[in-house]
Regions:
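Conserved beta-strand-loop-alpha-helix junction that forms the acyl-donor binding cleft
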Residues: 101, 127-137, 155-157
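Conserved acetyl-CoA-binding loop of GNAT-fold acetyltransferases
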Residues: 142-152
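Hydrophobic alpha-helical core bundles mediating ligand binding, dimerization, or RNAP-core interactions
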Residues: 26-30, 34, 48-51
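Acetyl-CoA-dependent GNAT
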Residues: 17, 39-99, 110-112, 116, ...
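Terminal substrate-recognition subdomain of acyl/acetyltransferases
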Residues: 2-11, 94-95, 129, 152, ...
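A short beta-loop-alpha structural element at the N-terminal edge
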Residues: 13-26
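Conserved acetyl-CoA-binding loop-helix of GNAT-fold acetyltransferases
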Residues: 102-117, 139-143
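Conserved GNAT acetyl-CoA-binding A-motif
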Residues: 117-130
Length: 176
């Protein structure tokens, strides 16, 4: 996730299921975010096809896009954190076009994906790798009731800060 609003702003964007036809609009900011190396532990320099396979995972994964004035400005995906007996817990990933960061698009996607995960029957949501220096994402997830369960020290090689921790964050989606 590359974006978090500076306050409690939530953008007014259309969020819908993505199709592979959306990939040409997603890939430029996907590549910018991944190659920047500050928020995602993915290899730098993924080809268009490699990146598409990373983002568009097969069912039961769902991928969404946020649209503002006809332009794809963000994307998210949600699916099970584990197969089998762990499939009742969701995980998700989020990206917002860095040119549109700080406007609440990440918050809008976050709320949307939480609602979708709940409607799909997931009982909780867990993020396994929130970079601790990505403070806008950490703040956003905490505002959306995620708690930091643990921080894995020196698990992420940040291009400026060196070895930093990865937070495992969690929130319940059901009341039971």
């Amino acid at each position: 996730m590359s974006d978090g609003p500076k306050d409690d702003t939530i953008a007014t964007v259309l969020i819908r299921d993505a199709t592979t036809d959306d990939w040409p609009a997603i890939y430029p900011f996907f590549r910018t975010i991944v190659d920047d190396g500050r928020t995602y532990a993915l290899p730098v320099g993924l080809s268009v096809d490699e990146a598409r396979r990373v983002w568009f995972e097969p069912a039961p994964w769902r991928v969404f896009v946020a649209i503002e004035n006809g332009v794809v400005v963000g994307t998210a995906k949600v699916g099970p954190v584990r197969a089998g007996r762990g499939s009742h817990v969701a995980t998700a990933s989020f990206m917002v076009d860095p040119a549109r960061a700080g406007r609440g698009i990440g918050a809008a996607l976050g709320h949307y994906v939480i609602d979708v995960a709940r409607s799909l029957g997931y009982r909780a949501m867990q993020f396994n790798a929130v970079v601790e220096t990505n403070t806008s994402a950490v703040r956003l997830w905490q505002r959306l009731d995620f708690r930091i369960l643990a921080t894995i020290p020196e698990a992420f090689d940040h291009p400026d800060a060196g070895l930093v921790g990865l937070h495992v964050m969690h929130r319940r989606l059901s009341s039971t």
